[in-house]
Amino acid sequence: MRTLWIVAVLLLGVEGNLWQFEMLIMKIAKTSGFLFYSSYGCYCGWGGHGRPQDATDRCCFVHDCCYGKVTGCNPKTDSYTYSEENGDVVCGGDDPCKKQICECDRVAATCFRDNKDTYDNKYWFYPAKNCQEESEPC
């Protein structure tokens, strides 16, 4: 059900940030965020609680924490600008809030790329009942 909700949001807000996040994941990690990270572990996908299950899930935990620190705009819907310089994604634009959203997404996409070897199919569609431990602080 959570995946259907994400699909609906992505389709409705194609110009918004969730679509851009998907594009950054594809560009940096060379994989689909929607297919591999939209419902993984305790933190990848909508919401998040408990303890991250592995390094991949921790990427999502850190991303959630990063979004939680953004003030003045909506990380899940606001669009941002970025460019590529020498193969690296560089967040830009005049709005510091939107630039911060871009940085959250860039860091998460890089984390996914750097931790591909920790991805474990047993955490794909991981039951929320297994994420009941107390969450660690950001």
From Swiss-Prot:
Supply the alphabetized keyword list: Antibiotic, Antimicrobial, Blood coagulation cascade inhibiting toxin, Calcium, Disulfide bond, Hemostasis impairing toxin, Hydrolase, Hypotensive agent, Lipid degradation, Lipid metabolism, Metal-binding, Platelet aggregation inhibiting toxin, Secreted, Signal, Toxin
Cysteines paired by S-S bonds: C42-C131, C44-C60, C59-C111, C65-C138, C66-C104, C73-C97, C91-C102
- Which cofactors go with this protein? Ca(2+)
> Which reactions appear under catalytic activity for this entry?
a 1,2-diacyl-sn-glycero-3-phosphocholine + H2O = a 1-acyl-sn-glycero-3-phosphocholine + a fatty acid + H(+)
Q: This protein's superkingdom?
A: Eukaryota
| SMART domains per UniProt | PA2c (SM00085)
Instruction: Supply the InterPro entries for this chain.
Output: PLipase_A2, PLipase_A2_Asp_AS, PLipase_A2_dom, PLipase_A2_dom_sf, PLipase_A2_His_AS
Q: Does the keyword Hydrolase apply?
A: yes
Q: Where in the cell is it found?
A: Secreted
By sequence similarity, the record places it as follows: Belongs to the phospholipase A2 family. Group II subfamily. D49 sub-subfamily.
Q: Extra notes? A: Negative results: does not show myotoxic activity.
Q: What is this protein called?
A: Acidic phospholipase A2 BmooPLA2
Q: Which organism is it from?
A: Bothrops moojeni
The opening ranks of the lineage are:
Eukaryota, Metazoa, Chordata, Craniata, Vertebrata
